[in-house]
């Protein structure tokens, strides 16, 4: 009996531990390929991942693979390098569920794209162009080749530096374009320049997509912080592309892909909050209530530690930035922005509102490229107790005097009235 | 009756009105005069309280309300007492002076309980 309970405790503890550690920066990766020769043509890409500790499991697209079993996912990341094959062993619904489970997906397109991949892209807010189209640009193409569809692309996303970490070397790109839905969750990581357009590869008949709305590479960070990246070109990840040159200078392809993939697989830009401290400093109420009971108009100190995940070191480091704090009861009564110090501590002193009720202290960071952080803490704010109001305020002395004068006046009036001998003649 | 009508129609000046008012007021019983005096006192106190509040602000608002309610309440109750014991109103047949005065005191007790509860 004793042994049995110890065994059960051990099993539960190990299950809990494993679930804790599988949380962030998971390395189990499924790679689905159209054809296993991609393993050779993209060897640098895969080798880099393996060097970073990713456990790659290569499967051909028609092999039966189970992503999820009893609500548990067998993989943390999914690389779908099988744009063409119609015999993909899992459906777009499976992939959506995989993303909903907080896992990451990297997938790429090619000249012809299967319905399955199109569905997945559409679920993620990307509408891939028709088959056999390419993005052309008659101004920004690789001048060493006559092919105008080999773009020299440098329209990187610039409002979320966390993703590409300040990359500014142009990259070579040849592939299919996609339209990116206008959605705060979608990031247009690489787009065509204003002279780019999408057209049929053979006939050259252009489609409606043009200019900067031509998405080349884009990402989605879902509300559960799962990250999905789609590239219109599978060749972008190939060895040939990594070592390609623009005007005899090295292209930025290798760095671009490395940074893109490491962001997609949650090696950085993940935030967490801890060590909440909400303390009463001073109070306007006169009564001696317990220190952890808040009354209206109390002066309080709020402090929260925010850390971001550093995938290279594999540990949490302080996040220095800005945090939005709201004190909400249906409406935000207080909304402030707090600057963090070097230790990632966000501290502020403020006065609680003059309204009682159950308030939510919501700290949030919505910074593009970072995971969304919403730290919610609820606490009631009580009204003053009957004995906690201030008494004998000097300004109120005339009022006290009035009340007493009325009392005494009535008393004197009563005496005079009663002892008056005058008879009312009826 | 006819003489008063003729005088009023002849010279309806302010002084004559005041004079006739005091003439007729002197005929009111003394008890009612005492009541009137007390009424004037409560009224003036009420006005003073209100002016003070306008000048100083409403900060201890409950105290102001208590003081103001106290003056207004006293005024209203005393007016009620005056109506009940005034012989012109013929309440004397159903309500005796003693009964009216006891009611008055009881109401005052309740009023001041409320006022002092509210004052703090």
Curated annotation (Swiss-Prot), chain A:
The record's Gene Ontology cellular component field reads: oligosaccharyltransferase complex
Keyword terms of this UniProt record: Endoplasmic reticulum, Glycoprotein, Membrane, Signal, Transmembrane, Transmembrane helix
Signal sequence annotation: 1-22
Q: How does it sit in the membrane?
A: Single-pass type I membrane protein
Q: What is its main location?
A: endoplasmic reticulum
Instruction: Tell me the compartments it is located in.
Output: Endoplasmic reticulum membrane
The UniProt entry's GO biological process terms, in alphabetical order, are: protein N-linked glycosylation via asparagine
Pfam families this protein is in?
OST48_MD (PF23358), OST48_N (PF03345)
Named in its record, the pathway it takes part in is: Protein modification; protein glycosylation
Q: Which residues lie on this side of the membrane: Cytoplasmic?
A: 420-426
Q: Which residues are glycosylated?
A: 286
Q: Which residues lie on this side of the membrane: Lumenal?
A: 23-398
**Which parts of the chain span the membrane according to its record?**
399-419
Q: What protein family is recorded? A: Belongs to the DDOST 48 kDa subunit family.
**Record's function text:** Subunit of the oligosaccharyl transferase (OST) complex that catalyzes the initial transfer of a defined glycan (Glc(3)Man(9)GlcNAc(2) in eukaryotes) from the lipid carrier dolichol-pyrophosphate to an asparagine residue within an Asn-X-Ser/Thr consensus motif in nascent polypeptide chains, the first step in protein N-glycosylation. N-glycosylation occurs cotranslationally and the complex associates with the Sec61 complex at the channel-forming translocon complex that mediates protein translocation across the endoplasmic reticulum (ER). All subunits are required for a maximal enzyme activity.
Q: How does it assemble?
A: Component of the oligosaccharyltransferase (OST) complex.
Name of this chain's protein: Dolichyl-diphosphooligosaccharide--protein glycosyltransferase 48 kDa subunit
Question: Which species expresses this protein natively?
Answer: Dictyostelium discoideum (Social amoeba)
| Gene name in the database record | ddost
UniProtKB/Swiss-Prot annotation, chain B:
Where this protein primarily resides, as one coarse class? Answer: endoplasmic reticulum
Q: Which gene encodes it?
A: ost2
List residues in topological domain: Lumenal: 58-60
The answer to keyword Signal applying to this record is no
Q: To which protein family does this belong? A: Belongs to the DAD/OST2 family.
A single GO cellular-component term on record: oligosaccharyltransferase complex
Q: What is this protein called?
A: Dolichyl-diphosphooligosaccharide--protein glycosyltransferase subunit 2
- Membrane topology value: Multi-pass membrane protein
Single Gene Ontology BP term?
A: protein N-linked glycosylation
Subunit relationships: Component of the oligosaccharyltransferase (OST) complex.
Localization, UniProt: Endoplasmic reticulum membrane
Q: Cross-referenced InterPro entries, in alphabetical order?
A: DAD/Ost2
Point out the signal peptide segment: none
State the source organism's domain of life: Eukaryota
Annotated source species: Dictyostelium discoideum (Social amoeba)
Pathway where this protein functions: Protein modification; protein glycosylation
Q: Which residues lie on this side of the membrane: Cytoplasmic?
A: 1-36, 82-99
PANTHER family attached to this UniProt entry: DOLICHYL-DIPHOSPHOOLIGOSACCHARIDE--PROTEIN GLYCOSYLTRANSFERASE SUBUNIT DAD1
């Amino acid at each position: 009996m004793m042994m049995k309970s110890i065994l059960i405790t051990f099993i539960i503890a190990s299950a809990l531990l494993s679930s804790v550690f599988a949380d962030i920066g998971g390395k189990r990766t499924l790679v689905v390929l159209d054809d296993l020769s991609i393993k050779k043509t993209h060897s640098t890409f895969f080798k880099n991942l393996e060097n970073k500790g990713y456990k790659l499991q290569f499967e051909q697209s028609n092999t039966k693979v189970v992503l999820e079993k009893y609500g548990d996912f067998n993989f943390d990341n999914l690389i779908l390098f099988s744009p063409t094959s119609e015999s993909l062993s899992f459906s777009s619904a499976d992939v959506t569920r995989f993303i909903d489970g907080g896992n990451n997906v990297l997938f790429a397109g090619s000249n012809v794209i299967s319905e399955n991949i199109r569905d997945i892209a559409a679920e993620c807010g990307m509408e891939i162009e028709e088959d056999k189209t390419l993005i052309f640009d008659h101004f920004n193409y690789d001048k060493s080749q006559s092919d105008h569809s080999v773009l020299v692309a440098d329209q990187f996303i610039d409002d979320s530096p966390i993703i590409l970490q300040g990359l500014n070397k142009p990259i070579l790109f040849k592939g299919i374009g996609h339209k990116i839905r206008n959605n705060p969750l979608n990031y247009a990581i690489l787009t065509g320049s204003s002279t780019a357009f999408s057209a049929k590869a053979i006939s050259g008949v252009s489609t409606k997509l043009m200019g900067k709305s031509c998405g080349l590479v884009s990402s989605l960070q879902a509300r559960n912080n799962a990250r999905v990246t789609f590239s219109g070109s599978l060749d972008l990840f190939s060895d040939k592309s990594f070592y390609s040159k623009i005007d005899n200078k090295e292209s930025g392809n290798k760095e671009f892909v490395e940074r893109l993939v490491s962001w997609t697989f949650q090696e950085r830009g993940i935030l967490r909050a801890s060590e909440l401290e909400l303390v009463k400093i001073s109070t306007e109420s006169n009564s001696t209530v317990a220190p952890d009971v808040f009354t209206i108009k109390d002066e309080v100190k709020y402090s929260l530690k925010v850390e971001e995940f550093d995938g290279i070191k594999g540990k949490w480091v302080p996040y220095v930035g800005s945090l939005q704090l709201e004190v909400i009861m249906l409406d935000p009564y207080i909304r402030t922005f707090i600057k963090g110090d070097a230790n990632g501590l966000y501290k502020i002193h403020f006065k609680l509102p003059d309204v009682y009720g159950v308030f939510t202290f919501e700290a949030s960071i919505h910074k593009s490229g970072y995971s969304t952080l919403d730290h919610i803490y609820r606490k009631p704010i009580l009204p003053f107790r009957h004995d906690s109001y201030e008494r004998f305020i000097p300004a109120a002395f005339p009022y006290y005097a009035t009340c007493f004068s009325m009392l005494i006046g009535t008393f004197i009036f009563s005496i005079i009235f009663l002892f008056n001998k005058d008879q009312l003649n009826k | 009756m006819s003489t008063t009508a003729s005088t009023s129609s002849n010279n309806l000046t302010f002084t004559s009105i005041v004079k006739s008012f005091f003439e007729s007021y002197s005929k009111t019983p003394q008890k009612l005069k005492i009541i009137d005096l007390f009424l004037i006192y409560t009224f003036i106190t009420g006005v003073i309280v209100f002016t003070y509040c306008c000048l100083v602000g409403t900060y201890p608002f409950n105290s102001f309300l208590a003081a103001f309610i106290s003056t207004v309440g006293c005024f209203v109750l005393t007016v009620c007492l005056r109506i009940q014991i005034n012989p012109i109103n013929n309440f004397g047949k159903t309500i005796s002076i003693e009964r009216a005065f006891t009611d008055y005191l009881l109401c005052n007790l309740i009023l001041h309980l409320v006022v002092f509860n509210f004052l703090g």
